[in-house]
A protein has these predicted regions:
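N-terminal Rossmann-like FAD-binding beta1-loop-alpha1 element of flavoenzymes
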Residues: 9-34
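Short loop/edge segments at beta-strand edges and connector loops
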Residues: 37, 128-129, 176-179, 303-305
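Dinucleotide-binding Rossmann-like beta1-alpha1 core, especially the glycine-rich loop
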Residues: 51-135, 288-290
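Helix-loop-beta segment of a Rossmann-like dinucleotide-binding subdomain
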Residues: 88-101, 113, 120, 124-171, ...
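Helical element adjacent to the flavin cofactor pocket in flavoenzyme catalytic cores
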Residues: 147-205
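C-terminal catalytic lobe of FAD-dependent flavoproteins
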Residues: 293-295, 299-369
Length: 369
């Protein structure tokens, strides 16, 4: 997959899950694609993610909810497709997610959310405390109840990224393990002509900026990009013996089972590009996880890590064409929803590049909004 390329039709900047999805989708539509990724940053968002597909769980406006549900549902077909073409299992698990209320106010809020989601045609249930205890033994004994979204779930983010990159390579994507210093334009920034690397320029008709929290640092962009890093700390511990696998969520955190581990998260910290772990952050995570699954109190974390999410001021990703520079596209700013929206973002960018339009209304996510 790694090649010395001097020109192509599309250059994707960033090899995390969003960039990998965009590169694969463009190649799938017959375009000649190169993906620039100098190497994984220890604080990158994709490998740090737990991989929840929580389209119906986290607070969202109508535009984000619709995008999330659509993105989640794509994994139903993407997972077997990637398994067939690459032999890689992305760990798609449609287990359902329970969002648990620990007080009456939270319970009332979640009951309202169940009613609203049902009215919108989504599958969503309210579990009384006794129903929750029966469905999720050992979970949240002090709960007042839970919203249960049976079609939500999870994927393994690392496996997903590897599979997207592998399938991209099968489709002809060239991997350039180099850092993009700046985009190159002509006609007073009216048109993209490629990207500048440390030792050369690679020509292209289209450049897709998909470098997550590092996107604003790419030189030559026509205007400041409103994306900032937000640190999310994570921890893992052994999944309690005898406890059925589950994905549990509340206002204080979440816990999900993957293999023999309990993945616990996560903080939301404005710490710049500081990807360090803190005692306070891990304590916060463990406290939230043990509220959801008290058996975790006896098993201290076996590993900890952090990632830097790319977050925008309005919480929506930036997806689509630059309003002024022809051939410049953005797929960044996904915040906590990068894994959830990766496949859909790839399809949107692929359709825009190949056909000039997408069947998805991306006006709420446009760079010019």
């Amino acid at each position: 997959m790694s090649h010395k390329v001097s020109s192509c039709e599309v250059i994707v900047v960033g090899g995390g899950v969003i960039g990998a999805a965009c590169a694969r989708a463009a190649a799938l539509r017959g375009l000649q694609v190169a993906l620039c990724e100098p190497g994984p940053d220890r604080a990158a968002a994709s490998p740090a993610s737990a991989g929840m597909l929580a389209a119906q769980i986290e607070p969202a406006d109508d535009a984000m909810r619709g995008l999330g549900v659509r993105g989640r549902d794509l994994y139903e077909t993407l997972a077997p497709a990637l398994l067939e073409t690459t032999g890689l299992d992305i760990g798609f698990w449609r287990a359902g997610i329970a969002s648990i209320a620990f007080d009456d106010g939270a319970a009332d809020h979640l009951r309202d959310a169940v009613a609203q989601q049902r009215q919108a045609g989504l599958r969503c249930d309210w579990l009384e405390a006794e129903d929750l205890a029966e469905r999720f033994p050992g979970a949240a004994p002090n709960a007042r109840g839970a919203l249960f979204a049976p079609e939500d779930g999870a994927v393994d983010p690392a496996a997903l990224t590897r599979a997207l990159l592998a399938d991209g390579g099968r489709l002809g994507v060239s991997l350039l393990p180099e850092r993009v210093l700046r985009i190159v334009t002509a006609e007073k920034q009216a048109r993209v002509t490629g990207v500048a690397l440390a030792d050369r320029t690679v020509s292209a008709e289209h450049v897709v900026i998909a470098a997550g929290a590092w996107s604003p640092g790419i030189g030559g962009l026509p205007r400041p990009l409103p994306v900032e890093p937000v640190r999310g700390q994570m921890a893992a511990a052994p999944w309690p013996s005898g406890t059925p696998p589950a994905i549990l969520y509340c206002d204080h955190g979440y816990v999900l089972s993957r293999g023999s581990e309990a993945l616990m998260g996560s903080t939301m910290e404005h710490a710049g590009f500081d990807g360090r772990i803190t005692d306070a952050g891990i304590a916060q995570i463990v406290d939230g996880a043990t509220r959801l699954l008290p058996a975790l109190a006896t098993t201290p974390p076996t590993r900890t890590w952090a990632g830097l999410r790319p977050v925008t001021p309005d919480g929506r990703p930036i997806v689509g064409r630059d309003p002024e520079t022809q051939g410049l596209w953005f797929a960044t700013g996904h915040g906590r929803n990068g894994i959830l929206l990766a496949a859909l973002t790839g399809d949107i960018i692929g359709d825009l590049l190949a056909h000039g339009e997408s069947e998805v209304d991306i006006s709420p996510f446009a760079p010019a909004r």
